[in-house]
Amino acid sequence: MPVSEFLIHPEYEILLILYRDIFVDEALLKNRFSREFQEAAAAIRLDEMDIKKIGLKEGGNARISGSSKAIVARVIKDQKPHQGYAFMPLSPWSNSLMHFNGENFAAMRVAKVKISHTTLPVTGLQELL
């Protein structure tokens, strides 16, 4: 484990919104354990201002903590500005960050999460199962 992982990276609260993605769905249908599926599904889209504020790099990794679990996902810079909001495709990675209260499935699509810089590798699908 690199020394940088022992340093405290500040966490920022952000609103995470889940969406369906045709490329993730296609990769899932081909092989849910493939590298193609992991690269498409374990990614978080942030705008340029949030990437700079949090200290992330496009293509780098971010640690995202939900109410019950934390994952590591790859950072993608979105073309449109949407400061304070992040987007992830529906997948085992994004679903692990959501909290279901048993009443409203729509509430599972939006959650406040904490995000910070990390040098750890992207969370593997086997770790989520």
Please provide the spans of the model-predicted regions.
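Long, contiguous, secondary-structure-rich segments that constitute the structural scaffold
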Residues: 1-129
